[in-house]
Amino acid sequence: TISSNHWMMAWTGLEINTLAILPLISKSHHPRATEASTKYFLTQAAASTLLLFASMSNAWLTGQWDITQLTHPTSCILLTMAISMKLGLTPFHFWLPDVLQGSPLTTGLLLATLMKLPPISLLLLTSSSLNPTLLTLMAIASIALGGWMGLNQTQTRKILAFSSISHLGWMTIILLFNPKLMLLTFLLYCIMTIAIFSTLNTIKTLKLSTMIAAWTKIPSLSATLMLTLLSLAGLPPLTGFLPKWLIILELTKQEMTPTATIIALLSLLGLFFYLRLAYCATITLPPNSINHMKQWQINKPVNTIIATFTTMS
């Protein structure tokens, strides 16, 4: 998909991408995993159909199959909606929390990072053809809804799903003005998300209630998890603050100060649940003291991955 310049090849790449992840989502054979894989398949198939319809209608009207030659207004709107559905932007976000909740943490990591690369590459290739008003409205709505819906969640995977929706809003709002900044934001988001998912997979935490006992068992890992969460929230002087600051700066240069102010205020909603995750991971203790050995060092290969990505984030 990334290297394609013909719509049929890009569509084929997206379909292969979708079919490859389905066995990983449903490998546990749990009813929730089956439901998640069904939702993912139906949503991605609908988005691919919409994408194909947009490219075919443009080819019918203009005679062009080249990705960069999408010029018809109707096709541009359909393309914007199709890629938004692929990524999980509001109002096409409905599938992402349920699919992440029904998937294992390792598969959820792939869904939140690597599986977003083909749609984001299509966004970059077709940025001149996208509808700017529609894209900006969906980006602001994603930042708002990602922060708002994450407030009352107790499942860590759903919290990270709404975090992903919110960060997608930050990426898409800057796409039309500075594509390189969008790539930087996506790269840093992937690094921080890999560190968080790997840590949660190591301490076997799926709920906030089970995260409370993490500090008594693995204090060093819980401390690094707190730093990564605060970086994902965008608190200075951590790494996650840099892309958000640069995005607000770029929007101000483009005379979009009201938009920059709105998304800066909406990011405070997300800050609350990041702080709640960090609070549960480090400050809270279980009600009953259990005498056991603290696992300061765990000899597992995944620890090298966690340490590397935590340092980078």
PLM features: residue spans?
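Core, highly hydrophobic multi-pass alpha-helical transmembrane subunits of bioenergetic inner membranes
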Residues: 1-313
